[in-house]
UniProtKB/Swiss-Prot annotation:
Cellular-component GO terms for this entry: cytoplasm; excinuclease repair complex
Gene name of the record: uvrC
Protein name: UvrABC system protein C
Gene Ontology molecular function, alphabetical: DNA binding; excinuclease ABC activity
Quaternary context: Interacts with UvrB in an incision complex.
Keyword DNA damage: yes
InterPro entries named among the record's database cross-references: GIY-YIG_endonuc (IPR000305), GIY-YIG_endonuc_sf (IPR035901), GIY-YIG_UvrC_Cho (IPR047296), Hlx-hairpin-Hlx_DNA-bd_motif (IPR003583), RuvA_2-like (IPR010994), UVR_dom (IPR001943), UVR_dom_sf (IPR036876), UvrABC_protein_C (IPR050066)
One of the GO biological process terms: SOS response
Length: 674
């Protein structure tokens, strides 16, 4: 059930507060523009929402937020647990300004064992299914690949694609170096391979002692039967496993699956360090930095009612510094902040995802309902350990240290980036009241001998690269290798729409009797960057100047980055389109460091896109030209033979064995490819 204050009537809190029930649910605050300010949950909606409007000693910041509330929506739920789940979903979907937000990282890597007769071991990201076996999640791709290398060395499981496996005629190099038992050519039976797969799975689950004991029994059995070669092979396998266990003795504990969560607040930012233990092995950690922290943490500044502890993401402001003090001091405030951030992380990270049976945490969670909901969702009891002992205590201490290191690194990088942004603005003579609003776009053209030409546009805003705003442009209709034409095309496509939108807004304002010129300027400034970097010299900048002149844009924002002698970093020259003399900044210039950083990112983004486009064209172009072969048949051919090279090497009989391809069509395909 949802209730809301009508947006077209003056906001009267008393009216809607009187209608709120004494029931659990979720509430949402909106401003006059319809933007969501905050999403919260409550065990008693009437009591919780009323506290924002009935308390008289609110802090100035909370009072300011309350004055911005133009509409309230509430949703009644059947239980507090249901309210918590709905709150978490709404926070992820709406990203309110005053809620703590963590990046929604759904694609944690897993180690996958496929359901093939000879299962393949593979690195995997994405949704899990019941058909295959999945181990993880792992904190990083490196942790997965390290585990794969260990399993290759000890159990020699295959890692090749099924299409390659089905077409092998002799063992690959991995078999020759003792990293695969070559099931592709029948060098091992399905039964023996299944034993290796089972041992590998138990190893990943932390049951290494069972595996070692069974291998020892197997070795003695072979020796008793005078099968000394087989006994020696098992002995070597035991030796490899013992070596791995010895190398990882420091990180192996009695726990099977545990997550360690440490939170540190400092310098106005918060870091959550998540360390993962799977199968008793410490797999590494990952640092998370929530956004909207300062805004979100203002909401509990004034102690909003007796129901405050029911809301999982409310806490006081993050202070710039947190010195040691008496109870109620900045140190206590920081501890409260860290606990609330931990609640937000647990809710956003684990609800809807796999949860290990044990969470070792640096702070006691504020929400009492969260643990019950996690246990219900996981299908097993989830325990939170606040004061661990032994190995768990060492893991938590290490996680806290890593959180402090990651946070210090972030703050240092932020300070460095802000200094670079300021230096560039001063160098170019830009007047910018808030450097965080300075927007820089950079363009680069990439191709190989005129093939697969692509242009890239990267964006620098709020003192960092904004990868979500990057764009690639496929360049068509030009002479291959003509970088000038490519630059003209991408700049026209990029900014022509922005100019049209500004003109439409100005026309609408004129029709409404508003000063069209001032509105148009405001519209253009919100759409266009402050600086446009062009990876190139005078020729590229001249093309950019022509495009901007045709579009009626200010050419003073155009800056070319010409490479220096020998293309050495630090010798670049800035070239301007408005007649200013070229500028050489020197290797130690903070402004040049920022320009080079943005330029290099544009080049990287263009190169990766160009390579992918070129590889796709080379792999599929000949198959797409085959008569009688559509998309489905082409996919079957690629799946059967592993790629274009395999299709070309196939005989007529092999082609005809593919589902949907007759013998006559196979002959036709063979003739077209040879």
């Amino acid at each position: 059930m949802t209730s809301a204050e009508a947006p077209d009537t003056p906001f009267e809190p008393k009216k809607i507060l009187a209608q709120l029930p004494h029931m659990p649910g979720v509430y949402r605050y909106y401003d006059a523009a319809g933007a969501v300010l905050y999403v919260g949950k409550a065990r008693d909606l009437k009591k919780r929402v009323s506290s924002y409007f009935t308390k008289t000693q609110l802090s100035p910041r909370i009072a300011m937020m309350v004055t911005r509330i133009a509409r309230i929506e509430t949703t009644v739920t059947r239980s507090e647990a249901e309210a918590l789940l709905l709150e978490n979903n709404l926070i992820k979907a709406l990203a309110p300004r005053y809620n703590i937000l963590f990046r929604d990282d759904k694609s944690y890597p897993y180690l996958k064992l496929t359901s093939h007769r000879f299962p393949r071991m593979a690195y995997y990201r994405g949704a899990v299914d019941k058909q295959n076996q999945y181990f993880g999640p792992f904190p990083s791709a490196w942790a997965v690949r390290e585990s794969i290398q260990i399993l290759q060395r000890v159990f020699q499981l295959r890692t090749c694609e099924d299409s390659v496996f089905n077409n092998r005629t002799r063992p690959c190099l991995l078999h020759q170096i003792g990293r695969c038992t070559a099931p592709c050519v029948g060098a091992i039976s399905a039964e023996d391979y299944a034993v290796d797969v089972s041992n590998a799975a138990r190893f990943l689950l932390g049951r290494q002692s069972e595996v070692m004991k069974e291998l020892e029994q197997k070795m003695h059995a072979f020796a008793a039967e005078l099968k000394f070669e087989q006994a020696a092979a098992v002995r070597n396998q035991m030796s490899s496993l013992a070596t791995v266990l010895h190398q990882q003795a420091i990180e192996v504990g009695s726990d099977s699956d545990v997550d360690i969560l440490a939170v540190v607040a400092q310098g106005g930012r918060v870091c959550v360090n998540l360390a993962m233990v799977r199968g008793g092995r410490h797999l590494g950690d990952k640092a998370y930095f929530p956004t909207h922290v300062e805004s979100a943490l203002t909401l509990a500044e004034g102690g909003l009612g007796d129901d405050t502890d029911a809301d999982a993401v409310e806490a006081p402001d993050v202070p710039a510094e947190a010195p040691v003090g008496e109870p109620g001091s900045a140190r206590d405030t920081t501890a409260s902040i860290e606990a609330e951030v931990l609640d937000a992380f647990i809710a956003q990270h684990y609800l809807g995802n796999r949860v290990p049976p044990v969470l070792v945490v640096s702070h006691a969670p504020a929400s009492r309902d969260l643990l019950e909901l996690l246990s219900e969702q996981a299908g097993h009891k989830v325990s939170l350990v606040r004061q661990p002992q032994g190995q768990r205590r060492a893991w938590l201490s290490m996680a806290e240290q890593n959180a402090q290191i990651a946070l210090a690194r972030l703050l240092s990088e932020q300070g460095s980036q802000q200094a670079r942004t300021r230096a560039l603005a001063e160098t170019l003579g830009l007047e910018c009241d808030d450097l965080a609003t300075l927007r820089i776009e950079c363009f680069d053209i990439s191709h190989t001998m005129g093939e697969a030409t692509q242009a890239s546009c990267v964006v620098y805003h709020h003192h960092k690269m904004q990868s979500g705003e990057y764009r690639r442009y496929n360049i068509t209709g030009i002479t291959p290798g003509d970088d000038y034409a490519a630059m003209r095309q991408v700049l026209t496509r990029r900014y022509e729409k922005m100019v049209e939108q500004a003109a439409q807004a100005a026309a609408a304002d004129d029709a409404a009797g508003i000063d069209g010129e001032s509105t148009r300027q405001a519209e253009a400034s919100s759409l266009l960057p402050n600086i446009v970097l062009i990876d190139g010299g005078k020729g590229q900048v001249e093309i950019a100047r022509q495009v901007f002149t045709e579009l009626g844009l200010d050419t003073s924002m155009l800056v070319g980055v010409a490479k220096g002698e020998g293309r050495k970093v630090g010798l670049e020259t800035l070239v301007f389109a408005d007649g200013r003399a070229p500028l050489e900044l020197g290797k130690e210039s903070a402004a040049l460091m920022l320009v080079a950083q943005i330029r290099d990112e544009a080049h990287r983004f263009a190169i990766t896109g160009m390579r992918a486009k070129r590889a796709k064209a080379r792999q599929t172009s000949r198959l797409e030209e085959l008569e009688g072969v559509g998309a489905k048949r082409r996919q079957r051919l690629l799946a059967r033979f592993g790629g274009l090279r395999g299709v070309v090497a196939a005989s007529v009989e092999e082609l005809a064995s593919v589902d949907g391809i007759s013998h006559a069509l196979a002959e036709q395909i063979y003739k077209q490819l040879h």
